[in-house]
């Protein structure tokens, strides 16, 4: 059989007509550097790269705008067809999967959506009638109703929780009568005014309980600072409210409550006298009110603060009931001094964050950190609270240069536009813009520090590098302390006429509309202060004791002579050669006249010789620097001074012939002798001072008069 099998094997090559099958190595060049790199790569690393490529494709599909638009259209269509159909839940799970992380930092469980009714059922509802922030407040209040139901504090829906959403109009939202706390959602809450009239019915046809709402309305009208009121009457709180001793400071929870007020409640607060008595009992700062033989009411400026006080008062009442039952009376209990321990308990708790705000960058309000933890619990159970978490739970990965990337202490918070339902896909698309806004609003300041560099061998290098560090000095922080503005009339003075405030506001708006440029508002404190102008740095005062000013050399000239002198100066500045030649000819004629007259020494008296000697000595003792500008002698100032002296000398004596020469720049000599002859060669001729033409005319006039 083996021989038959061996005979059946074909060992000849296939015929040439059979097509050649392409192999893997025929498509790859073994000398390709990319192929060599992949061949030398480890299998695990190659598998990781393949998984990254696959995830990249999925991410591109999920982040594509076309896929998002199609998914949003499908969700809107399913919501129009019916309430929570199966297709809508499936699409909602896909939307949650696309969102990489929910608000709390955890992904929502996919199978829990069908177990409970979601709290935030407003994405498809009409929210155009809601005021700013009402959508978020409705979600918070509905979540609080669910917490009260889970804690077992609900008493057949006879306990109520209300929240004021508008101080201007005093609008309050509350659950309607007949609706269980486990059914509370953001859409079925009823909005009423301060007197109980319905403003927004919500998604149900149920009415509110006016008797149960009356304590809430009385508290809101008495305390403008209160925003949330929680009223419960559980077994423990009702038992303590019937005790004459009230809430005893025997536990830490009772010390966290602060001052407690007590009021004899008769079942309603419709009468004006009862409201006045409640206002006297409640005071301006009390946060816990015990209704005698009825229950307990907790107040708060925020919903989180009110829950903080109602949780602690419920726990304190339970402790007190158990302690009295075990001890057999108040005398057997160790009662603490509240005033002694107030600084360690109530003051620390009232500062916010349960006492964890000490030097941290994240500032928590009273009860906020605990309330966020409970909201995360509800979200993980599938309640879909819609709560806007202030701080995420999961810590972000450290970035490059994270020592200066410190998150802002307080960021600007703005409510979203409630007129259009916000899709979770659009919310994720705006993540980058929100991250940018987060750092732009940071009030942190940094300082430049020079840090020595480290060399390769581990030693400290003399070179330094610049590092930015956060400024620890609180006085250098430019952001300041943020102030929460809840009331639009917060900065309006008390006892002001509202009509005047409205008129002033309208005037300011008109000024902004017409773009008027004014000096701004005038301060009432600085209006009567007279500010002296600072003295100028340069003060010019007349000094009577100082030396007299030099006389004006042109004071004795006429207007015609001044005009002629100005024209002469202009011709000199323009470089006209004719003017120079004319002046030289005038000087030559005057010098020749002087020479002809000085050649007869018998006509000069002895008195003139003495004057000549004095005049020559005075000129010889004076040094005149020679300045050359553009190749010419700039001797205008010297000429003016010499001309003055010559004119004075000519008026006091009968001297008519004076000759002044300059021999060298270092020394000026005047030679007044009859041997001076102007008939020498021009190259050896001594340079003479040229006198102005108006002086020559004066000399001619004097000669004629003489």
UniProtKB/Swiss-Prot annotation:
Q: Which GO terms describe its molecular function?
A: actin filament binding; calmodulin binding; protein kinase C binding; structural constituent of cytoskeleton
State what this protein does.
Answer: Membrane-cytoskeleton-associated protein that promotes the assembly of the spectrin-actin network. Plays a role in actin filament capping. Binds to calmodulin. Involved in myogenic reactivity of the renal afferent arteriole (Af-art), renal interlobular arteries and middle cerebral artery (MCA) to increased perfusion pressure. Involved in regulation of potassium channels in the vascular smooth muscle cells (VSMCs) of the Af-art and MCA ex vivo.
Name one matching Pfam family.
Aldolase_II
Residues annotated as carrying N-acetylserine in the record are: 2
Against InterPro entries, the record matches this protein to: Aldolase-II_Adducin_sf, Aldolase_II/adducin_N, Aldolase_II/adducin_N_sf
Q: Identify the coding gene.
A: ADD3
In terms of domain of life, where is this protein from? Eukaryota
Q: Where is this region: Disordered?
A: 1-20, 471-497, 535-555, 575-610, 666-706
Instruction: Give the GO biological process terms.
Output: barbed-end actin filament capping; positive regulation of cytoskeleton organization; positive regulation of vasoconstriction; response to xenobiotic stimulus
Summarize the subunit comment: Heterodimer of an alpha and a gamma subunit.
Coiled coil ranges (UniProt) are: none
- Reported disease: Cerebral palsy, spastic quadriplegic 3: A form of cerebral palsy, a group of non-progressive disorders of movement and/or posture resulting from defects in the developing central nervous system. CPSQ3 is an autosomal recessive neurodevelopmental disorder characterized by variable spasticity and cognitive impairment.
- Please report the record's description of how this protein sits within the membrane: Peripheral membrane protein
- Subcellular localization, as worded in the UniProt entry: Cytoplasm, Cytoskeleton; Cell membrane; Cytoplasm
Q: Where is the composition biased (Low complexity)?
A: 589-602
- Protein name according to UniProt: Gamma-adducin
């Amino acid at each position: 059989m083996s021989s038959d099998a061996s005979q059946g094997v074909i060992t000849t090559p296939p015929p040439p007509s059979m097509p050649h099958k392409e192999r893997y190595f025929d498509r790859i060049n073994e000398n390709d550097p990319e192929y060599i790199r992949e061949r030398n790569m480890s299998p695990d690393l190659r598998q990781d790269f393949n998984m990254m490529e696959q995830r990249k494709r999925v991410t591109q599909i999920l982040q594509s705008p076309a896929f998002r638009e199609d998914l949003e259209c499908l969700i809107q269509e399913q919501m129009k067809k019916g309430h929570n159909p199966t297709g809508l839940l499936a699409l909602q799970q896909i939307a949650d999967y696309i969102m990489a992380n929910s608000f709390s930092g955890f992904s929502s469980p996919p199978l829990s959506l069908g177990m409970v009714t979601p709290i935030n059922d407003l994405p498809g509802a009409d929210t155009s009638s809601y005021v700013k922030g009402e959508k978020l407040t409705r979600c918070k209040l509905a979540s609080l109703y669910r917490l009260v139901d889970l804690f077992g504090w609900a008493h057949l829906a006879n306990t109520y929780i209300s929240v004021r959403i508008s101080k201007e109009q005093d609008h309050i939202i509350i659950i309607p009568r007949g609706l269980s706390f486990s059914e509370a959602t953001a859409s079925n809450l009823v909005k009423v005014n301060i007197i109980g009239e319905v403003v927004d019915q919500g998604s149900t046809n149920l009415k509110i309980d006016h008797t149960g709402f009356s304590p809430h309305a009385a508290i809101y009208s008495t305390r403008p600072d209160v925003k949330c009121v929680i009223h419960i009457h559980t077994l423990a709180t009702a038992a303590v409210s019937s005790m004459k001793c009230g809430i005893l400071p025997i536990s830490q929870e009772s010390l966290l409550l602060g001052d407690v007020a007590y009021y004899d409640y008769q079942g309603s607060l419709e009468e004006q006298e009862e409201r006045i008595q409640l206002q006297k009992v409640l005071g301006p700062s009390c946060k816990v009110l015990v209704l005698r033989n009825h229950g307990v009411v907790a107040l708060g400026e925020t919903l989180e603060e009110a829950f903080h006080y109602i949780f602690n008062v419920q726990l304190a009442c339970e402790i007190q009931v158990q302690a009295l039952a075990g001890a057999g009376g108040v005398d057997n209990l160790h009662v603490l001094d509240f005033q002694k321990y107030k600084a360690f308990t109530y003051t620390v708790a009232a500062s916010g964050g349960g006492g964890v705000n000490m030097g941290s960058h994240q500032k928590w309000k009273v009860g906020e950190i605990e309330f966020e933890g409970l909201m995360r619990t509800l979200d993980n159970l599938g309640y879909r609270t819609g709560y806007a978490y202030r701080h995420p739970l999961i810590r972000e990965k450290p970035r490059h240069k994270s020592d200066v990337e410190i998150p802002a202490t307080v960021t600007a918070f703005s409510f979203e536009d409630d007129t259009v339902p916000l899709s979770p896909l659009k919310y994720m698309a705006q993540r980058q813009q929100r991250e940018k806004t987060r750092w732009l609003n940071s009030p942190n300041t940094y300082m430049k520090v020079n840090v020595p560099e480290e060399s390769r061998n581990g030693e400290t290098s003399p070179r330094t590098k610049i590092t930015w560090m956060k400024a620890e000095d609180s006085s250098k922080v430019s952001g300041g302390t943020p102030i929460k503005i809840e009331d639009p009339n917060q900065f309006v003075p008390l006892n002001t006429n509202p009509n005047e405030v409205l008129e002033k506001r309208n005037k300011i708006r008109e000024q902004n509309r017409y773009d008027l440029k004014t000096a701004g508002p005038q301060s009432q404190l600085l209006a009567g202060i007279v500010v002296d102008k600072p003295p100028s740095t340069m003060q010019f005062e007349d000094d009577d004791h100082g030396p007299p000013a030099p006389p004006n050399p042109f004071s004795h000239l006429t207007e015609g002579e001044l005009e002629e002198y100005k024209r002469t100066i202009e011709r000199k500045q323009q470089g006209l050669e004719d003017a120079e030649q004319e002046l030289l000819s005038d000087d030559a004629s005057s010098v020749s006249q002087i020479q002809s007259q000085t050649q007869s020494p018998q006509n000069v008296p002895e008195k003139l010789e003495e004057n000549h000697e004095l005049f020559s000595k005075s000129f010889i003792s004076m040094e005149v620097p020679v300045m050359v500008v553009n190749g010419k002698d700039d001797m205008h100032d010297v000429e003016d001074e010499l001309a003055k002296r010559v004119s004075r000398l000519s008026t006091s004596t009968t001297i008519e012939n004076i000759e002044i020469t300059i021999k060298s720049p270092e020394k000026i000599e005047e030679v007044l002798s009859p041997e001076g002859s102007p008939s020498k060669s021009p190259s050896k001729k001594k340079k003479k001072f040229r006198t102005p033409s108006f002086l020559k005319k004066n000399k001619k006039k004097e000669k004629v008069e003489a």
